[in-house]
């Protein structure tokens, strides 16, 4: 038994979509979450800067005595995950491979779309992972840089959000049967995305898929939390306005949470 928390990092609130699924599947595990909303989005930034910011988040989580770190951010996974994983002596998990694997299982026509930040799409990481496992699958990647600001400003239900999503996804409509939400912010726009793509297109939440791998690693390294513990205390940190973060988090997690501000 290991009652230390699992650490989650993201460029903002998007990683909460992963946390929500973890709380549902593994309610006995403690969580420490850090969202760098003050510097979001990461997608348009240079690789060097993304690595620097990611290491700051990692080092913060290490001060919280975490037993595992989850990159709940596709951009950070694409740019810095391998480097961090090699440097630490605790498990470090990214969201890309679980999402890629789920897309392969889902597609029936071998036509997969991937949407993400400019950096994630430019890295071509999803196409590489998907075609490494299933060379015959065709992958269409599309950067959607306007999606993260919509979520970070809590405007997911606005009319402008609907227009931006509709306009952004137009190049993929009718051309794919599976769409990977290659940014953990994007599931917060899921109803609009599904409406634009149509009911026949399967949406893959890479963050939610990641939780299955978390469970596997907890078992493999024998670091599961206390299954009998009913009341688990989580801690949430943000580098930006804690009130906005708390509002979004409370809606998504369906529970009131306390959010602490931190300066990195």
From Swiss-Prot:
**Any one Pfam family match given in the protein's UniProt record, by short name:** Asp_Glu_race
Any idea of its EC number? 5.1.1.3
Question: Keyword ATP-binding on this protein?
Answer: no
Q: Which residues form the active site?
A: 73, 183
Can you state which reaction this protein catalyses? L-glutamate = D-glutamate
Q: Which family does it belong to?
A: Belongs to the aspartate/glutamate racemases family.
Highest taxon of the lineage: Bacteria
- Pathway of action: Cell wall biogenesis; peptidoglycan biosynthesis
**Xref: InterPro entries:** Asp/Glu/hydantoin_racemase, Asp/Glu_race, Asp/Glu_racemase_AS_2, Glu_race
Q: What does this protein do?
A: Provides the (R)-glutamate required for cell wall biosynthesis.
**Record protein name field:** Glutamate racemase
